[in-house]
């Protein structure tokens, strides 16, 4: 699949199969995230991979979407505003931009691996 085909194949899915995501696929996805660009390469992010149903159910109390409980795996993206680059002119914090780029890497890598995602 070339890049354009990959981008066309990616969409926000809210229907998931009830099977675990293979560790090799998660490792591949996280390697793609590690290589994602960020301002001054500061990578002001942390990711948490959640695969157990109990924790996913707890997360659903914070993010009330029915489809969340059907996902076999959730990757939580967290931005660290203290670690991100701040533009001198106006002190603009780039954590939101950096994490958005990294999350899109997750979505594209997952799609390439045959997995569905939701932004």
Question: Where do the language-model regions lie?
Answer:
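Acidic, surface-exposed loops and disordered segments
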Residues: 1-119
């Amino acid at each position: 699949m070339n890049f354009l085909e990959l981008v066309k194949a990616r969409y926000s899915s809210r229907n998931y199969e009830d099977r675990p995501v293979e560790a090799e696929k998660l490792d591949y996805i996280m390697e793609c995230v590690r290589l994602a660009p960020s301002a001054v390469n500061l990578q002001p992010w942390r990711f948490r991979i959640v695969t157990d149903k109990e924790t996913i159910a707890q997360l659903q109390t914070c993010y009330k979407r029915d489809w969340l409980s059907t996902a076999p795996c959730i990757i939580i993206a967290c931005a660290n505003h203290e670690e991100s680059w701040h533009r001198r002119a106006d002190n603009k914090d780039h954590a939101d931009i950096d994490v958005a780029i990294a999350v899109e890497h997750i979505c594209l890598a997952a799609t390439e691996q045959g997995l569905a995602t939701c932004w």
